[in-house]
From Swiss-Prot:
GO molecular function term, any single one: copper ion binding
Name of the featured protein: Metallothionein-like protein 3B
Xref: InterPro entries: MT3 (IPR044671)
Keywords: Metal-binding, Metal-thiolate cluster
Family per similarity comment: Belongs to the metallothionein superfamily. Type 15 family.
Amino acid sequence: MSDKCGHCDCADKSQCVKKGTSYGVVIVDAEKSHFEMAEEVGYEENDGKCKCTTGCSCAGCNCGK
């Protein structure tokens, strides 16, 4: 595994943003409708043990181990 957290988008090194899969659900009722958003954050690469530092490096974890 690299020194980068698997769940961070490090295109911009000044910030570390969690990546995930977003699902949108539209619920339609006879009188109203609304949109609900759910997010599933992917921790497959690092088993959820990684913490991202401001430089997007992996700190205090065993990424992918």
